[in-house]
Amino acid sequence: MEEFKRNLELDRSQQHDFIYPLIFQEYIYALAHDRGLNRSIFLENTGYDNKSSLLIVKRLITHLITQMYQQNRFLFSGNDSNQKKFFGDNTNLYSQMIFEGFAVVVEIPFYLRLLSFLEGKERVKSHNLRSIHSIFPFLEDKFSHLVYVLDILISHPIHLEIVVQTLRYWVKDASSLHLLRFFLHEYPIWNSLITPKKSSFSFSIRNQRFFLFLYNFHVCEYESIFVFLRNQSSHLRSISSETFLERISFYRKIELEVFAKDFKAILWVFKEPFLHYVRYRGKAILASKGTSLLMNKWKYYLVNFWQCYFYMWSQPRRIHINQLSNHSLDFLGYLSTVRLKPLMVRSQMIENSFLIENASKKFDTLMPITPMIGSLSKAKFCNVLGHPMSKPVWAALSDSDIIERFGRIYRNLSHYYSGSLKKMSLYRIKYILRLSCARTLARKHKSTVRAFLKRLGVGLLEEFFTEEEQVFYLTFAKASSNSGELYRRRVWYLDIICINDLANYE
């Protein structure tokens, strides 16, 4: 039993990082504020003082308290709304600096663990595994042999205090956790992470780093169950269920008699060796070679795990059981299916020959055209039916900038959907963007689309012909004499680490 406890701790007992003194490092706030939320902060410190300083933090907190007091005073006195807005903006500015600095500090222990994990490993390989496209070769290799899949939407915790309680097993620093708890209790708007509203969306964006840290940690805790089951699946048959209930950081010490009775009955679920798990953001996939009964057991276990450990009510509609042979998997912008491919094999035996018909499974990935047109419609490139429209907000730009923006959007889409089995949907997206670009230019110069297409001609076409397409045809044209075979080629890139919303191009 003692050996099992050590395995279940997942090396958390080695974490004794006291990060609270770093909160009073002046360069932390300068680095977090100057570099912004979307850049890496783990770089060498050049130009900042490494000595501890209470001055910068004291100033920030003093300004924050002062402005909050003045904001409340003006709020109840009914004075000019411009003054309230001015103080409110300053309050957000000071709070943003404090939250960004705190997020940087709390991330340090996790980053140190990442560095220790990467020591001795090939740097190129680790970067390749960061690519979103690296998931699809794995799916192609594994999912064609599986039968059922659990389509999971990861739930949010009921209250962010639960995240603080689980965070204390990783960060052995009570002072930092008290400060985190203070943030969550003093600013109720942080609960918008659970139920996002339009009124709090701007605040969430300004403190995006802190939101992402809390959510990623929550997902990391959720996924720790799969690491444990992977390591211990071959030893579960001889282990008593009481051992699981004694782990504080794995299951809360609960006295629910129903859960204790049912736990032994579902323990055999973990013996399944053909189990694969994939996640991106808030959506996860759990695929197995087992039966429908086995997948229902998994669904039952996950619901109990979320409710008893994370105190969250997992709705049944957040977990769907689907059969891969007759269900399209919507994941990472692709529609993935496992279809049967007939194969005729001729067998020769002395004087007789036989034709044997076999069916092999093949994993296909397709670009869904309907959601993509919906995204283009939301970004005002076309209407809901896919008819191209002009982009009035870009009419003030130069002609070269307009063409470059439209071309860049298509090149990014073509780069990402290069793994699609059929390229017809991608060609339709090219048509929409090219005509939308022409209509935007015609609107700017108060002319007709026909005149601009005649004027630009090949120039507009070249801007929408990607470098990947040129390399693609030069690479596979000689090896494929059949144009249909060339049309179905798939290419996965290992340099794609994020998916941007088309609306960001406003």
Curated annotation (Swiss-Prot):
Molecular-function GO term, any one? RNA binding
Give the protein's biological function: Usually encoded in the trnK tRNA gene intron. Probably assists in splicing its own and other chloroplast group II introns.
Coiled coil region boundaries: none
The domain of life for this entry's organism is Eukaryota
A Pfam family cross-referenced in the UniProt record is: MatK_N
Where is it mostly found? plastid
- Give one GO biological process term: tRNA processing
Q: Name one GO cellular component term.
A: chloroplast
Keywords tagged on the record: Chloroplast, mRNA processing, Plastid, RNA-binding, tRNA processing
Q: Which family does it belong to?
A: Belongs to the intron maturase 2 family. MatK subfamily.
Q: Indicate what this protein is called per its UniProt record.
A: Maturase K
Source organism per UniProt? Rhododendron tomentosum (Marsh Labrador tea)
Instruction: Provide the protein's localization.
Output: Plastid, Chloroplast
